[in-house]
């Protein structure tokens, strides 16, 4: 049981890091910090296609990570 949960946790961590790195950045870097990012406030686009899929997959993988960590702490593994 311990080995299974640990393997699932490692796979989930690798998948979560990969999905987060595949997502497109939402900031303009330093220029966005200086200008205050006002153009993003009024020109916000809805996520579509692969961006929406990656966003939802990040949420699912995060919930799985949270549940696996609760399981590890509950069972004292």
Swiss-Prot record:
MF terms (GO), sorted A to Z: protein-transporting ATPase activity
GO biological process: intracellular protein transmembrane transport; protein secretion; protein transport by the Sec complex
Topology class, membrane: Multi-pass membrane protein
Primary localisation category: membrane
GO CC terms, sorted: plasma membrane
Domain of life the protein comes from: Bacteria
Keyword Membrane: yes
Keywords: Cell membrane, Membrane, Protein transport, Translocation, Transmembrane, Transmembrane helix, Transport
InterPro entries: SecG
Transmembrane feature ranges: 2-22, 57-77
Subcellular location: Cell membrane
Classification via Pfam families: SecG
Function statement: Involved in protein export. Participates in an early event of protein translocation.
Similarity comment text for this entry: Belongs to the SecG family.
NCBIfam families: secG (TIGR00810)
Protein name: Probable protein-export membrane protein SecG
Organism expressing this protein natively: Staphylococcus saprophyticus subsp. saprophyticus (strain ATCC 15305 / DSM 20229 / NCIMB 8711 / NCTC 7292 / S-41)
Origin organism lineage: Bacteria, Bacillati, Bacillota, Bacilli, Bacillales
Gene (UniProt): secG
